[in-house]
Amino acid sequence: MLDKRTDLAGPGISTYEAVEKILPHNYESLLDVKRTQQAIYDVKEYIEKGLAKELNLMLVQVPLIVEASSGMNDMLDRDGSRTPVEFPCGLGLDIPIRASIVQAATKWKRWALQQFQCDVHEGINTDMRAVRKDYFLDHDHSAYVDQWDWEQVINEEDLTLSYLTDIVKKIWKVFVGAEKMVMDKYPELQDPRFPPLPEELHFIHAEEILAKYPDLPRKERETRIIEEYGAVFIYGIGWVLDDGYPHEMRAADYDDWVTPTIEKDGKLMHGL
């Protein structure tokens, strides 16, 4: 078992010995290579359209490279240990541009909301590509990242747990719908070993999970809670919990993990 401090640094398994144990050595795809690619793009198209509809988003392009001095890149966590790939570029320039490959589009998206003149409760979505050279590589984490990044303009009064919960439910609705679509279109994917996504999410604060499993590091706490409920959304993963550790190290310059959001039995819990 990892100790709690070792277990803080982002997603994934954290040791290559554990990766070796968890990776199946007899894996066979349920679809052939061609149909796998077709299914991937069907799912991506469904989710893109679903997010656009549910969250009022427009699809935009995001840069792969930004100027290192722009402040647009993402350090991924609060201790600055995951640095971006940087290189000089600009043939013929007396002073080359110091370029930086994006690790995430988090800061750029907030600038882009203004650039695209989005109104309140309008937003953007982008199919972001990035390189995270300092990522631990495991069964579902790569140094190459291809992910959706979305952002929405909200009012200050929207900074509530109820608004966050409503947004998460809309996203989950899209995911469940995407699974149903791809299962119907590719019936080979209907395998009893892989049960369908639950229709409903269970919402819980990181402090409450710690109270249930006080002696376990957070990844094992996550495993226990997901075994109990099937699908879980965790509030408050960045604020320091009762045991002196945050649920996970989060970036200090854009994630809101300090806003008080829940009070139970006279106790304040932090972090959206």
Q: Which functions belong to the PLM regions below?
A:
Residues 121, 126-215:
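Extended, charged alpha-beta segments that form solvent-exposed binding/catalytic grooves
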Residues 2-7, 11-141, 149-153:
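Class II aminoacyl-tRNA synthetase-like tRNA-binding/catalytic domains
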Residues 111-126, 180-185, 237-261:
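A short, terminal or domain-edge coil/loop segment
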Residues 42, 145, 229:
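Short, well-structured alpha-helical interface segments that form or flank functional binding sites
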Residues 32, 36, 53, 71, ...:
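Alpha-helix capping and helix-coil boundary motifs
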Residues 50, 54-58, 174-178, 182, ...:
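Short secondary-structure junctions and interdomain/linker hinges
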Residues 203-272:
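A translation/RNA-centric and nucleic-acid-associated enzymatic feature enriched
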Residues 92-110, 162-167, 211-237:
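Hydrophobic transmembrane alpha-helix bundles
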